[in-house]
Amino acid sequence: MLELLPCLGFGLLFGWHRPLWPVRLAPPLVRFGVPLSIAGLVLRSGVHWDVLGAALLTLGLIGGSLLLLLWPLWRRWLPWGVTRLGAVTGNTGYFGVPVVLALLPPAGLAFAVIYDIVGSLITWTVGPPLISGVRISGRSLVAHLVRSPSVQGMTLAVLLQLTPLAPVMASWLWWPARVVIVLALLLLGMRLGVMLRSGEVNAPALEVLRPALLAKLLLLPAVMWALAAMTAQPALVRDVLVLQAAAPTAISVLLIAEASSRDVSEAAGLVFASTLLALFSVPLWWLLLQALG
């Protein structure tokens, strides 16, 4: 988390003076960076079958929330695909995982990574058609799943784990994974710099994002806490999953919006505002979890 503010600051300056840079950076970051990041996280954490319960809870929370938000009733509050996706997918890579490393025992890392992997799979499978406005069908979902950077990253990690070089590659890929996170933060700062230069960042624009922010930072972690309680998850697993659910909107939402050239300003505003608010809301969730025992 130490790189958060410097990267946002430098990115903002770059975006202010070089407004075309975000458009050029997003495609290669999605195409090559995301698979490397996923592979590095998987190899580093050593994900095993004991995280299956956490994976199912994550799938139920994010997938179920997206299905619920498809109802026309929610269109009034979350009018764009980018707000619906941003309300349920969290930025666990640069925010949630470091929070777990800082606040919880090392055993919690695997559960944080599995949340990130499941969330990334859903984001990169459902996200492109949802944001671009293309009608979602079974065939299109399968096509997006096959082309998903997360699936490519998982495939790379599985293949590497089958070789004797897995420990070495885990160390080598960890640093490229961190570089991808830094580049994604720079991209967010650049997009915000472009928005500030054009006057797109203002109170009315952020007001429209309020329902998505409330859902992401308050409602989603509360639902995850209820699911963990109902399934009698251990305290460590519960704490990890709730803190991951409380993470700000995923930078992947901005990357998909950039690649689709749709609702980019709304995506950047949602990621930026949720990140700032999460600096206060996540510690409050942590204190609440400690009080609950």
State each model region's role.
Residues 1-293:
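Alpha-helical transmembrane segments of multi-pass small-molecule/ion transporters
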